Amino acid sequence: MNNDNLHDKLTIWRQQQIELKGMLQLIPKFQSLNEIRYVVGLDISFDKSSPKAVSALVIYDLEQRMIIYKDYLCIEKLEEDYVPGFLSFREIKWYLPLLNHIPHQFRIDIILVDGNGVLHPVGFGLACHLGVLLNLPVVGVAKNYLHCVGLTESLDAHRETLKKHVLKKTTDHPILIHSIDQSSEILGAAVWTSSNSKRPVYVSIGNQMNLEQSIQLVQKCSSSHSRVPEPIRQADIYAKFVLSQSKRNKKN
């Protein structure tokens, strides 16, 4: 795709994000985290040697600490390249069939997805996009920091912030991520999910949640095994397993 076509596409996508942002619901659905039991985790695993990928969904029973349902979708080729700030247009179409295919006997309380929510250049990341389309509570949990030019501190500055925080041994408290403009709006948080975590995950509101609830839920869903909360971690493990089995079967 040439630069002109890409620019036109991104302009259309940005307009869609801005329009859909008006449908965000930032008033929490839940009065207490005790109302949340069934947590959907979503992730995509990519084959490093081919265009193939696998999207995976798990339903995690937070009370029993176990997976009660899982599904996957094999992707021959992702149709869009990754462009920072436009992840939803690359990945959301591979999540929606899985979400729409969940049997009716399973209840969904909330979704955790590998990606950002309002911590985003226009405040409408993948987690927000999913939440608006499905009218469900969603929390964005990104593994890496997304620098939003003119909105959040640079990557180098953020690394210094993390370093100081770790040296103070205050990783049991999240770092709130503020916008650097005059509003100083809180966009999300860098969260260490356990005492074993060397790096944080980046938590932000997707839909029908507030940030305090979102942070508490991510911590509640996490274990000492990984900095990534279990619903997303288990979806990632499952996607990688399906991808490896597919490659093994092809060789045989």
Swiss-Prot record:
The record marks Y82 as: Interaction with target DNA. Keywords: Cytoplasm, Endonuclease, Hydrolase, Magnesium, Metal-binding, Nuclease, Nucleus. GO terms for biological process: DNA repair. Mg(2+) binds at D43, D114. It comes from the Eukaryota. Its EC number is 3.1.-.-. It is found in: Cytoplasm; Nucleus. It is an enzyme of class 3 (hydrolase). Gene3D superfamilies: archaeoglobus fulgidus dsm 4304 superfamily. Disulfide bonds: none annotated. GO terms for cellular component: cytoplasm; cytosol; nucleolus; nucleus. Its main location: cytoplasm. GO terms for molecular function: metal ion binding; RNA endonuclease activity, producing 5'-phosphomonoesters; single-stranded RNA binding. Belongs to the endonuclease V family. PANTHER family: ENDONUCLEASE V (PTHR28511:SF1). This is Putative endonuclease C1F12.06c. It comes from Schizosaccharomyces pombe (strain 972 / ATCC 24843).
